[in-house]
A protein has these predicted regions:
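A flexible loop/linker signature enriched in serine peptidases of the S9 family
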Residues: 1, 15-21, 35-83, 98-105, ...
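Short coil/turn segments that connect the beta-strands within blades of beta-propeller domains
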Residues: 28-30, 113-115, 164-166
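Short loop/turn segments that connect beta-strands within beta-propeller blades
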Residues: 4-8, 88-92, 140-144, 189-193
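Acidic, proline/glycine-rich low-complexity intrinsically disordered segments
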Residues: 6, 108-111, 115
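Residue-level detection of beta-strand scaffold positions
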Residues: 110-112, 142, 154, 185
């Protein structure tokens, strides 16, 4: 939904199958980017027999190969992955930008030209077991092509794009597997080059 201040009206932009989160306006105000979970199929080892009329059966067993399949407070996590979408600010059909069995988490930020979305996430193959590590990624809105801007053992996060769209400030550290580690402030060019600690 969007609340238009001038008219005081609320407009429904789309009807989505899951809840969108981390909504971000494009620089020209014509598009919204957001993250949303895309369900994947439950694993099944056998097909149960047909339920007899009047039978009161227990729920079928849940089978998972996921490292993190439960969460405190919400219990079992249904299978699926978070992906990025864009939708016209006036409403319409959302278009999925990212794909695959990876979670494209983090609040998307638009590049100054509106051609890319930047996120802080972990898109590596072993992401489930490397939960302390995140990188900053630049994703083409047109093609979904992903470019990794940072690449080290440790989190790179909480980034901000400069007003001229040419640099990115972010915090992070080289993970030394200690219980407490000090985050540092860095800057780099929008293409991931010229990284330096401030």
């Amino acid at each position: 939904f969007v609340y238009w201040i001038k008219t005081g009206k609320v407009a429904r932009l789309s009807q989505l199958e899951n809840s969108p989160s981390r909504v971000s306006w494009s620089p020209d105000g014509k598009w919204l980017a957001f993250s949303m979970k895309v369900p994947s199929k439950e694993l099944s080892l056998v097909s149960p027999p047909k339920k007899p009329k009047g039978a009161n059966w227990a729920d079928p067993p849940k089978i998972t190969t996921r490292f993190k399949h439960e969460s405190d407070g919400s219990g079992y996590i249904s299978p699926g992955f978070n992906h990025l979408f864009v939708i016209p600010a006036e409403g319409g059909t959302p278009r999925q930008i990212t794909k695959g069995d990876l979670n494209h988490r983090g609040t998307p930020q638009w590049s100054s030209d509106g051609g890319h979305l930047l996120i802080s996430s972990n898109l590596k193959k072993d992401w489930e077991y490397d939960f302390r590590n995140t990188e900053i990624y630049k994703i083409s809105v047109e093609s979904g092509e992903v470019k990794t801007l940072t690449n080290r053992n440790g989190p790179d996060r909480d980034f901000a794009i400069s007003p001229d769209g040419q640099q990115i400030a972010y915090v992070g550290f080289d993970d030394k597997m200690q219980t407490y580690q000090v985050s540092r402030l860095y800057v780099m060019d929008i293409d991931g080059s010229n990284k330096k600690e401030v």
